[in-house]
Design a protein with these regions (language model features):
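Short, solvent-exposed loop/beta-turn-alpha elements that line the ligand-binding surface or hinge
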Residues: 119-130, 173-175, 218-236, 242, ...
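Extracytoplasmic "Venus flytrap"/periplasmic binding protein-like
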Residues: 62-130, 166-167, 266-267, 284-288
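Short, polar/charged alpha-helical segment
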Residues: 43-65
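Glycine-centered hinge/linker elements that transmit conformational signals in sensory
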Residues: 184-188, 222-254, 294-299, 408
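Hinge/lid segment of periplasmic solute-binding proteins
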Residues: 100-155, 184, 287, 291-300
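Extracytoplasmic/periplasmic substrate-recognition and gating elements
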Residues: 248, 285-359
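Extracytoplasmic/periplasmic solute-binding protein
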Residues: 141-149, 154-156, 181-226, 233-234, ...
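Conserved C-terminal helix/tail region of periplasmic/extracytoplasmic solute-binding proteins
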Residues: 383-453
Length: 453
């Protein structure tokens, strides 16, 4: 009997201890927690995610003793570098934040063992609310390390105000921008119409090549290497190179939105999230300004019967803390941010797509929930692409980030050099068509050489 009582008492004590431990590991006003975050959404002074974080801090965060502190709003590449410096213990490196937004490539930088497994906190029911493909692609060896919070795709942006004047003079139309063949022909005509101004900027040549080769049934990447020797690559390189060498495409570094502002370009391909930075007016060299209408169109196609586009979007990572309070706080914040109402408010303020199925259905059922009217054409373009296009996620492989960056820089470098040679040789009296054809070939040879180094 005494033994039985002892066992019962021991069980009660253990249960009480477990209960106390569980309570102490949950955030609350009596157990306040501060989480630091680095993210990429906007800027320090103009950020849709900062607005969402402020709302969280003043509501659910306050109720649970949680404060999310935004330490840095910067680019994904800057976050990659800062995380690498922190993970490697480099002198002067900032401490790794409790939360950060990034692309899947950071897992190899930070290390899986240092990241929180969201599966340990979200229930199966909670995860089932996410769009299936968004959640299924973010597992790493069956471990959910990256939680999707916003997704983007790509679109074609156009300064319609200036384009309309160009159209009236030349007969080109917006319908010509449905395909890359039409886009490139339009770009060359614009270069002539303006006596030497670029028509557009391509914000990601890696995406252009990936979708272009997919459209022809080929693969841009195989065994972690770019397939620049594939004959299909020449199909997509030739019209791009011809237009860039002629002068229709801006090949300088920097953001397209900045060049829109000064009318250096009037169009670009880029993320749907770029709408956050599109200017409402432009300024001319004589310092006069003009209000403009900007629109977004579906991503141009390569072939008539195959439509494809990249969809992407980083996710929310959490550092796996020894302090369980921080892990629980990270879950509470992540759950709040991905709930339908809060996620819709955040993403539609930034040109992104929500990550839950019910939120996506709500968005495309009624665009009026998007407060900024200038964003409506972005979501209309996305709606068309959801209906007609195949969406592709970029492949993950070791060194993918570096390969993508190198390809981007190499493409711009070889085409810029070729453009300068074209202008010089044509001005010296050489036949433009002969020079152009030669430079298309030599630029590809140089690109292959740089890519193999």
């Amino acid at each position: 009997m005494k033994r039985t009582v002892a066992i019962i008492m021991t069980s009660v004590i253990l249960l009480m201890c477990f209960s106390c431990c569980t309570q102490s590991e949950m955030p609350g006003p009596e157990n306040p927690v501060t989480l630091t975050i680095w993210h990429v959404y906007g800027s320090q002074t103009k950020s849709p995610l900062n607005i969402a974080i402020n709302e969280f801090n003043s509501t659910v965060g306050k109720e649970n003793g949680i404060t999310v502190n935004v330490v840095s709003v910067t680019s994904s590449s800057a976050i990659d570098k800062a995380l690498a410096a922190s993970a490697n213990g480099e002198p002067g490196a900032e401490a790794m934040p409790d939360l950060f937004t990034a692309y899947p490539r950071v897992v190899e930088i930070v290390g899986k063992e240092n990241l929180l497994n969201w599966d340990d906190y979200f229930t199966e029911k909670e995860l089932s609310a996410f769009q299936t493909e968004f959640i299924s692609e973010v597992y790493f060896d069956n471990v959910l390390l990256m939680l999707p919070i916003a997704k983007s795709t790509e679109a074609f942006y156009l300064n319609k105000t200036i384009f309309d004047r160009f159209s009236n003079d030349t007969g080109v139309s917006i319908d010509d921008l449905n395909t890359f063949a039409g886009v490139f022909e339009t770009a060359r005509k614009y270069y002539d119409w303006t006596d030497g101004q670029n028509f557009m900027q391509i914000n990601d040549y890696y995406h252009y090549a990936y979708i272009g080769m997919k459209s022809y049934g080929a693969e841009f990447v195989r065994n972690s290497r770019l397939r620049l020797d594939d004959e299909v690559f020449m199909k997509i390189w030739k019209p791009l190179a011809e237009t860039a060498i002629y002068g229709g495409i801006c090949l300088d570094d920097g953001y397209a939105a900045s060049r829109w502002k000064t009318v250096e370009v009037i169009a670009n391909t880029g993320s749907t999230a770029d709408v956050l930075y599109q200017p409402a007016e432009v300024i001319y060299p004589d310092n006069t300004t003009e209000d403009i209408t900007a629109i977004a169109l579906p991503y141009p196609t390569f072939v008539d019967d195959t439509f494809g586009v990249i969809y992407r979007g980083g996710g929310l990572f959490a550092r796996n803390s020894e302090d369980e309070l921080k892990n629980q706080a990270a879950y509470i914040f992540a759950k709040w941010l991905t709930e339908k109402e809060h996620n819709l408010d955040f993403v539609t303020d930034a040109g992104y797509l929500p990550v839950r199925t019910d939120a996506i259905e709500t968005l495309f059922a009624d665009f009026s929930i998007v407060e900024k009217e200038s964003y409506h054409s972005v979501y209309q373009a996305v709606e068309t692409m959801i209906s007609d296009y195949t969406f592709y996620a970029l492949p993950l492989y070791e060194g993918a980030s570096e390969t993508q960056l190198d390809f981007e820089q190499n493409v711009k470098a070889v085409l810029k050099t070729a453009h300068n040679q074209y202008i010089k040789r044509v001005n010296q009296g050489e036949d433009p068509e002969t020079v152009l054809n030669e430079l298309v070939e030599t630029s590809l040879t140089e690109l292959k050489k740089l890519s193999s180094e």
